């Protein structure tokens, strides 16, 4: 083993400890910008579609199904660890398990869990216990988005994926509270995804009365704003429908 913990340098120059990540070392804009630049599916989409936008859409789905700011924020940060370790695709993990055994996958789960905990604590949250029903809302949204994104942003697959596709609910634009041609459902370039992610964070932390890392970070006015059209679409997506 190494004499000291492995760490990585963030965009802003600080070193981030991967073994004992501290909530105070989590820079929220570093997550927002890095996830906006990180492409889903190993950047193999037809055009840039980011991890940041994926998380925003997950937050929208969970919000519309629960109307709980906290759960929606958890959905909106469920892949935030990828800002530090990248998007290690599931087939790659399976290949590593094939070559080196289950210890590799177990180690990756442990690493992700540590990072997730530090990121959540930056927002004054703690990880949910395994049996918490909120986990199911988040995992359902993640699986459903996987299939929706594949159809919308990738080429037609040359064979079946190793997933029970028939068991997964097929999303439509209505699930997001949006029209089919909404720009929010189009693949956005990194600079728009960066602003989109911050819009989600501001919206959910303000609505829940949670400040956490946002209040402690640099001047919020210097952070990216979302263009007005996308901001209006976010208003629609996060609107609470009142039954007549």
Task: Show which residues each predicted segment covers.
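Metal-dependent phosphohydrolase cores
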Residues: 1-244
């Amino acid at each position: 083993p190494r004499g000291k913990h492995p760490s990585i340098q963030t965009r802003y120059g600080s070193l981030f400890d991967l073994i004992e990540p501290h909530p105070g070392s989590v820079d929220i804009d570093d997550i927002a910008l890095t996830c906006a630049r990180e492409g889903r599916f190993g950047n193999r989409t037809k055009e840039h579609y980011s991890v940041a936008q994926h998380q925003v859409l997950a937050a929208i789905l969970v919000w519309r199904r629960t109307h709980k700011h906290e759960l929606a924020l958890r959905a909106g940060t469920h892949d935030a660890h990828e800002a530090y370790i990248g998007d290690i695709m599931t087939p790659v993990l399976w290949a590593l398990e094939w070559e080196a055994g289950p210890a590799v996958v177990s180690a990756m789960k442990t690493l992700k869990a540590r990072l997730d905990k530090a990121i959540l604590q930056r927002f004054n949250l703690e990880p949910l216990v395994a049996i918490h029903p909120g986990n199911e809302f988040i995992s359902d949204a993640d699986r459903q988005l996987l299939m929706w994104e594949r159809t919308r942003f990738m080429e037609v697959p040359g064979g079946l994926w190793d997933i029970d596709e028939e068991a997964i609910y097929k999303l439509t634009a209505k699930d997001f509270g949006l029209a089919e041609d909404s720009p929010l459902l189009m693949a956005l370039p990194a600079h728009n995804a960066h602003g989109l992610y911050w819009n989600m964070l501001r919206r959910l932390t303000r609505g829940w009365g949670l400040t956490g890392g946002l209040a402690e970070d640099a001047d919020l006015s210097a952070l990216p704003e979302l263009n007005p059209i996308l901001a209006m679409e976010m208003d629609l997506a996060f609107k609470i429908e009142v039954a007549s």
